[in-house]
Amino acid sequence: SGISHDLRTPLTRIKLQLAFIKDEQISKKLSDDVQEMEKMLNEYLQFASAGSAEKSEKFNLSDLIKNIIKKYENHNIVSEINESIVMHGRKNLITRCINNLIENSIKYAKKVHIQLNKTNNNNIIIIDDDGPGIDEKEYDNVFKPFYKIDKSRGGAKSSVGLGLSIASDIVRSHGGNIILEKSPHEGLRVKVFFPF
């Protein structure tokens, strides 16, 4: 699309200019930054196109989450998934949202706990981890696109990403809410509410 081309052109120009930088260390660092920007751009364009094309459907949220967790079998994930919780929404986007949240947790933690429960008017997904957590003052900021945390959870593995921003957009586009809290496992707790 035109937007995709407009966004990629400056990155292509930067990549061409990188070839002229003599200092290998600087060139490598800038090249890594450009690759990360390309990855984020692709991620966002995928999200934008999937969101506009996909129709809402009724699906089993319990089964969806169990299938997502299977992909992460090499990680220490403990789950308590209430059986047969059904929701109405855009299934691929919900999958994307949950993937982004799990990936954010496993990036920083040794152990991740995932729960799915139902209240009178919400399906609630809770993702806890035992990582370094996030300062309470940063809770709102981490949902902003490209926001980078200075320390703790923003250590060496930190990335200026769109994962949490996209997850938040998906939740809100379904009339839901996403909040962060301190986890009882010492790290971060992410609570996602999807209304019926």
Question: Language-model segments: which ranges?
Answer:
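Conserved catalytic submotifs in the C-terminal HATPase_c
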Residues: 78-89
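Conserved glycine-rich
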Residues: 175-176
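Short conserved segment of the HATPase_c
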Residues: 134-146
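Short beta-strand/loop element within the Bergerat-fold HATPase_c
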Residues: 111-121
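Acidic ATP/Mg2+-coordinating residue in the GHKL
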Residues: 129
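A residue-level detector for a conserved hydrophobic packing site
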Residues: 94-98
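Short alpha-helical Gxxx[C/S/T] motif in the catalytic ATP-binding
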Residues: 163, 167
